[in-house]
Amino acid sequence: MVPMRSDAPLKIIVIRRDNIGDLVCTLPMVTALRARYPDAEISALVNSYNLDVLKGNPELDHVYAYTKAKHRPPGKSVAGVYWDRLRLFARLRRERFDYAIIAGAHFLPRALRLARMIKPKHIIGFTEPKPGAHHIDVGVPYTLPQPMHEVEDIFRLLAPLGIEGTPPAATVVADAKEVVEARALLAKQDWPAGRRLIALHISARKVSQRWPVERFVALARRLHQESGAAFLLFWSPGDSSNPLHPGDDDKAREIVTGLGGIPILAYPTHRLGELIAGLSLCEAVVCSDGGAMHIAAGLGKPILCFFGNSDRKRWHPWGVPHVLLQKESREVTDISVDEAAEGFARLLEKTKGG
């Protein structure tokens, strides 16, 4: 265990620069840090694309975000992006952090570069026999003696700070204003009170994770017939022909049309905060492996998830009841409607009395 300062609360910054699911899987680390060091000043450094995952998080004192050039808003130059980044890191250096934690599996040179720009007293991270690893002065040699979840893997970085054991659940907090707007949309539907509200998230980045539209329609019909359920439909907005950011507008329209007479609200989410708020109102979630699945887990939602060519041991929903369906082919298209319906029934059994 590394020595701790005794004259003032610790100042710790957790760095995670990659995808939405990765960031959600870092949140148990933040919760454990707060439990072990309740008086510490705990911050996070993320990219602007993922920022909403951390908004309102009660365990964090400060959240800092930098913009990647590919995520810059319209009218913002690349030079402007880098100038803003330089100013941000000048500010972070003035904070004089005790520890910067590079939250990610393996030795991560790019994240290490960010940590060094902050100039903390100590850098905690995984090390491997690679150039630059010597800059991590509180190193944890990276080995993977057995398969483990992403949450468990990176949680090992807290051992130098005296934190070990089973990681807690992730905590994602929906923005109160976004939730009010989502509730207002639902209120306009004039659905009978007491219906089970189920989220259907139909988009997936990997082709092997995409469940066919007609099966979402058939599954929703069956779940409605069995319990009178209503649905919120989520997808990645946009045209499927867009080469840079293909979306699933066409699929969403097909599903809404196919479910004529069944209560379903199409809920396009152009911002991450909208997705978080919408999912927060649902009783359960049906989706493929991906960022939305991890957000749902962070919101504490029971999940029926479809896994294609993904490592279920590494990426299953963390800390919530779930049923994971994966075929030997590692193709989601091989999962039948019957299997999905049976999986959802098992999910409800898991949540009874919980």
Predicted ranges, named:
Residues 1-354:
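Catalytic machinery of carbohydrate-active enzymes
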